């Protein structure tokens, strides 16, 4: 069994100035304790393994936690339902955020297991990997996703992030079953060469599954998972090639977002909150 040591000491140093953002009974904040991170891992286990049917390894099966070595070097964004109280059940949404320094401590970013990140690593600005995004089934809807995006915008502003990236998943492991979605993404949202990470050779799945002229763009967009549609709304690109993730029963694509393309409403909302100005 693999043991992962949890410590929020480094995270507290990075996120001490992050002020919780509220929307009614919900709030978005950074994890500041080991218990916070454990609650995020428990939520991830419920969503990824119990709900979506991912195949757990020995540690996940025994601990009922989705956890790995990257958790210790990441910042964890949490959506909290305050009326539930201070316990782990109050964490209803989460995102894992990894900067260059955290990745250096491990020796790689998480996405490097699927993609050659060379073009992104050569990017001269500050980069941030987004991952392990999930929301409790009872809370899936606009409110929680809006809060998560507001939290990301706040974090980006606080840390001067210039580029975000990370894997996003489509359900299933048959790329031909999602041929229109993959072909649409490749044809309409392929990253420019300077930012075009490519799936590793032994994992590369061509996204051009059909004649681009035969793709109904509107239907393809509607068929995309909400998370990917959200990324596209803030100007996301995709890398070259999809990757089959059989343990998680998904097909992954790499998302790349230049933060100067992020829809202004999130940043402007955060700035208004910081000034104490109502929406």
Where are these regions (language model features)?
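Short, positively charged
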Residues: 9-16, 48-58, 177, 205-210
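Short loop segments at secondary-structure junctions
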Residues: 82-84, 101, 138-139, 259-262
């Amino acid at each position: 069994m693999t043991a992962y040591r949890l410590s929020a000491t480094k995270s507290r140093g990075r996120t001490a100035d992050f002020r919780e953002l509220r929307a009614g009974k919900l709030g978005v904040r950074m994890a500041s304790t080991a218990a916070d991170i454990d609650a995020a891992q428990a939520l991830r286990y419920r969503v990824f393994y119990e709900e979506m049917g991912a195949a757990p390894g020995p540690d996940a099966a025994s601990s009922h936690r989705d956890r790995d070595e990257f958790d210790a070097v990441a910042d964890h964004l949490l959506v909290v339902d305050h009326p539930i109280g201070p316990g782990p059940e109050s964490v209803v949404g989460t995102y894992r955020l990894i900067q260059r320094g955290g990745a250096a401590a491990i020796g790689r970013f998480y996405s490097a297991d699927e993609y050659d990140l060379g073009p992104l690593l050569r990017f001269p600005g500050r980069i941030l990997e987004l991952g392990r995004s999930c929301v409790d089934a009872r809370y899936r809807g606009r409110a929680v996703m809006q809060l998560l995006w507001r939290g990301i915008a706040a974090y980006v502003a606080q840390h001067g992030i210039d580029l975000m990236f990370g894997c996003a998943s489509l359900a299933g492991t048959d790329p031909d079953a999602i041929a229109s979605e993959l072909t649409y993404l490749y044809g309409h949202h392929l990253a420019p060469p300077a930012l075009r990470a490519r799936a590793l050779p032994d994992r590369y799945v061509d996204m051009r599954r059909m004649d681009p002229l035969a793709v109904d763009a509107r239907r393809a967009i509607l068929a995309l998972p909400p998370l990917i549609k959200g990324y596209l709304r803030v100007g996301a690109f995709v890398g070259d090639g999809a990757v089959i993730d059989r343990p998680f029963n998904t097909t992954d694509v790499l998302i790349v977002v230049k933060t100067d393309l992020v829809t202004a409403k999130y940043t402007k909302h955060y700035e208004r909150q910081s000034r104490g100005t109502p929406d």
